[in-house]
């Protein structure tokens, strides 16, 4: 199977779109960062380093300090595909992030986005 082009895209090139999507719906950059931190384990400083280095998506997730074990609770459809059915691990992580940002932009409460019971 051919390598998907998003793997080689820099996280820094997509990050502003995540922030813009959230801010357009009245949410904040801090909330986007909180979601990314929850999913990947990057703290604010580490996240900024990844952005500054223009790390590609594949490396961004491969180097993630602590992928959250609760991320498997993320369910739903992104780009017409159920995230829980994506077999390729890196693509699944990317779509998890897309799904969380979508939920933020739709106004879902942060506790529900972060799968807190």
Where are these regions (language model features)?
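A charge-rich, low-complexity, intrinsically flexible signal that marks solvent-exposed coils, linkers
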Residues: 1-117
């Amino acid at each position: 199977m051919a390598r998907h082009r998003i793997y080689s895209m820099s996280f820094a090139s997509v990050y502003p779109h995540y922030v813009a999507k959230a801010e357009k719906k009245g949410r904040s950059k801090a909330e986007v960062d909180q979601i990314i931190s929850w999913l990947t384990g990057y703290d604010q400083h580490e996240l900024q380093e990844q952005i500054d280095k223009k790390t590609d998506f594949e490396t961004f997730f491969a180097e993630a300090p602590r992928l959250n074990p609760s991320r498997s609770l993320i369910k739903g459809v992104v780009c017409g595909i159920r995230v829980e059915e994506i077999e390729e691990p890196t693509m699944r992580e990317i779509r998890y992030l897309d799904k969380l940002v979508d939920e933020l932009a739709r106004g879902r409460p942060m506790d529900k986005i972060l799968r807190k019971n």
